[in-house]
From Swiss-Prot:
Pathway the protein contributes to: Plant hormone biosynthesis; gibberellin biosynthesis
Function: Converts the inactive gibberellin (GA) precursors GA9 and GA20 into the bioactives gibberellins GA4 and GA1, respectively. Involved in the production of bioactive GA for vegetative growth and development.
Name of this protein: Gibberellin 3-beta-dioxygenase 1
Catalytic activity: gibberellin A9 + 2-oxoglutarate + O2 = gibberellin A4 + succinate + CO2; gibberellin A20 + 2-oxoglutarate + O2 = gibberellin A1 + succinate + CO2
UniProt KW Protease keyword: no
Family indicated by similarity: Belongs to the iron/ascorbate-dependent oxidoreductase family. GA3OX subfamily.
Ranges for domain Fe2OG dioxygenase: 204-308
A GO CC annotation given for this chain: cytoplasm
Tissue specificity field: Expressed in stems, roots, leaves, flowers, and siliques. Highly expressed near the nodes in stems and in the stamen filaments of flowers. Detected in developing cotyledons, vegetative shoot apical meristem and non-meristematic, non-elongation regions of the roots. Found in the cortex and the endodermis of the embryo axis in germinating seeds and in the placenta in developing siliques.
GO BP term, example: response to gibberellin
Enzyme class: oxidoreductase
Activity's dependence on pH: Optimum pH is 7.5.
Length: 358
């Protein structure tokens, strides 16, 4: 990430106990600090969608002739979808999964050599959203912004260059895919490149930036009382998630409650982020999601968090705003929005909404 965006985190340091991350494999009982109740998160016990409904986020074949409309419909109704035939080699997905498993399989003290600082973005630690909750989450993460060389050298003195190559190749594929998906979704609304000059599909994508988030949700002795990653929306345009074959990701829909997203081999999950919600004037839904944990199987995921450069103003596309109404949201840069999110968390979107109801 450019320095400007990194400065947001320096200006909002969070005091998270990275050094107190336990050796999850040694815990046979769930510590009280990891036991969640509805008091800790109002949506913790929200009713899950009954399996009989058969409702789930769509799996979209990007080679399907109607993929554009299918993606648009998914963004409007779910705020999330899965994709196949996405062009990312299966071998590369296997490589990034192997890297992620290798990293989190290291001894805790080795991982702490690359711990994220209070004012930093990159490195090992707990989720930044942990500061908004009283209870701890049953997970560990590793954030990559820019080159991971220095951090990886601390973790793997002998093999860090190979792992850096995997990350670089993965990010290159993700950047192209994210831009393609954004434009497929916007095209479904009749939006063209003439309407958003800063995001040309034919450019070298220098208008965008991203972070890579590696996540590990260890086996948990009491999964029904624990939380892997608490409910939140992403501050991105789009997030592209690769998950191994262990279920745990859940998305929330008002009429269904929590819906578990089943892993399909080789597929990727795409989440609409807050900035895409703003850009679409609220037509595309920024999806509330969380991660639950498992008693018998660990879960790994890799999230590509994608958005614009720090100085690009994001505002509703004029074509999507009624001539007799004002845009639903104020114009905001990613840098400005992250500041708002750092203070107001899941209420951040409502804070920049025009004509807020008091």
């Amino acid at each position: 990430m450019p320095a400007m965006l990194t400065d947001v985190f320096r200006g909002h340091p969070i005091h998270l106990p990275h050094s107190h991350i336990p050796d999850f494999t040694s815990l046979r009982e769930l510590p009280d600090s990891y036991k969640w109740t509805p008091k800790d998160d109002l949506l913790f016990s929200a009713a899950p969608s009954p399996p009989a409904t058969g409702e789930n986020i769509p799996l979209i074949d990007l080679d399907h002739p109607d993929a554009t409309n299918q993606i648009g419909h998914a963004c409007r109704t779910w705020g999330a979808f899965q994709i196949s035939n996405h062009g990312v080699p299966l071998g590369l997905l296997q490589d990034i999964e192997f890297l992620t498993g290798s990293l989190f399989g290291l001894p805790v003290q080795r991982k702490l050599k690359s711990a994220r600082s209070e004012t930093g973005v990159s490195g090992y630690g707990v989720a930044r959203i942990a500061s908004f909750f009283n209870k701890q989450m049953w997970s560990e993460g590793f954030t990559i912004t820019g080159s991971p060389l220095n951090d990886f050298r601390k973790l793997w003195p002998q093999h860090h260059l190979n792992y850096c190559d995997i990350v670089e190749e993965y990010e290159e594929h993700m950047k192209k895919l994210a831009s393609k998906l954004m434009w497929l979704a916007l095209n479904s609304l009749g939006v063209s490149e003439e309407d958003i000059e800063w995001a040309s599909l034919s450019s070298d994508l220098n208008w965008a930036q991203a972070a890579l988030q590696l996540n590990h949700y260890p086996v948990c002795p009491e999964p029904d009382r624990a939380m892997g990653l608490a409910a939140h929306t992403d501050s991105t345009l789009l997030t592209i998630l690769y998950q191994n074959n262990t279920a745990g990701l859940q998305v929330f829909r008002d009429d269904l409650g929590w819906v578990t997203v089943p892993p399909f081999p080789g597929s990727l999950v795409v989440n609409v982020g807050d900035l895409f919600h703003i850009l679409s004037n609220g037509l595309f839904k920024s999806v509330l999601h969380r991660a639950r944990v498992n008693q018998t199987r660990a879960r790994l995921s890799v999230a590509f968090l994608w958005g614009p450069q720090s100085d690009i103003k994001i505002s509703p596309v004029p074509k999507l705003v009624s001539p007799v109404e004002s845009p639903l949201y104020q114009s905001v840069t990613w840098k400005e929005y992250l500041r708002t999110k750092a203070t107001h968390f899941n209420k951040a979107l409502s804070m920049i909404r025009n004509h807020r109801e008091e």
